[in-house]
């Protein structure tokens, strides 16, 4: 199950520097877990999770395989992208294929790095990109409404639902609000997602600050945090230059560097976790002598669907899930101890998997 977060930003905001750090990190991790494919514009990185190493120690696992997040470097954006200016059409097509948007904003002062608008104003920069995405959505909605006129007149149920959702989105956009602000019911969610509106995607604002401001941010990043809170979006403060330096060091050197800078952890770790949370994801584990592994699922996933993440046949032939809560697995020294203490539960098809569950699936076939 792949989850893609697109990294976007205006020119000279540090987007490429940040992405280079991500891809170097991904390259360094490539030997540690399988299926890590790295293309020029894609970086697949491990999701930091201290729980996995603890499980592996208890289970005496030979290998440790973390959950993964994919970041996609989206072509640079300029004002007018919705009309095809610059690489506008490519930008919009690439963003449509992602699950969320990480919007890099310039929150640093540097006279040697020019800004396309000749000023440093991250909130205004965010508005520039948001406006382009909203204009593109409005154009897309108008075309789609025209294309379904005949089906709507014929009373086609699917077309009628699509028309209603498109008009709700259109009204929000015309009022100056992105599509993600529209309240959609669970029953309508699938049809809504199929519209693939650019502004319906969750947003993470990445405040790129100077190296000496990485620990606490600055006035610019404070404004972005306030804006994100008002929008119900997420934000993270990071120094792309620091991340690029860290990505070239071995783990021990990187930790020393972080200590010197007064940072508890790499900004990329916070960025990856924030992207994970933004997509409403959670982790379950499998642990044994061969491997300890973290698996990614959406919150609210039922046990059979979680089994299907491991292999499609597990979902089809699902019988039950032997479940141990993470804390119980640690407290009782692993599967055998937890089972003896009565902490292993047999859960059926209706079980909603919890974050941190250590699972073993029984299935037919």
Where are these regions (language model features)?
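Conserved Switch II/interswitch segment of TRAFAC-class P-loop GTPases
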Residues: 43-48, 75-85, 96-157, 172-185, ...
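Glycine-rich, flexible loop/turn motifs
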Residues: 26-34, 41-43, 51-54, 83, ...
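C-terminal-of-GTPase-core extension/linker across diverse P-loop GTPases
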Residues: 2-8, 13, 19, 147-354, ...
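Conserved G1/Walker A P-loop phosphate-binding module
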Residues: 1-114, 142-143, 148
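Short capping/connector residues at structural and topological boundaries
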Residues: 6, 35, 40-43, 50-52, ...
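Generic signal for short, ordered secondary-structure residues
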Residues: 17, 34, 70, 120, ...
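Short, glycine/charged-enriched secondary-structure capping and boundary segments
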Residues: 22, 84-87, 116-119, 218-222, ...
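Amphipathic alpha-helical transducer elements in NTP-driven molecular machines
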Residues: 35, 49-52, 62-71, 85-99, ...
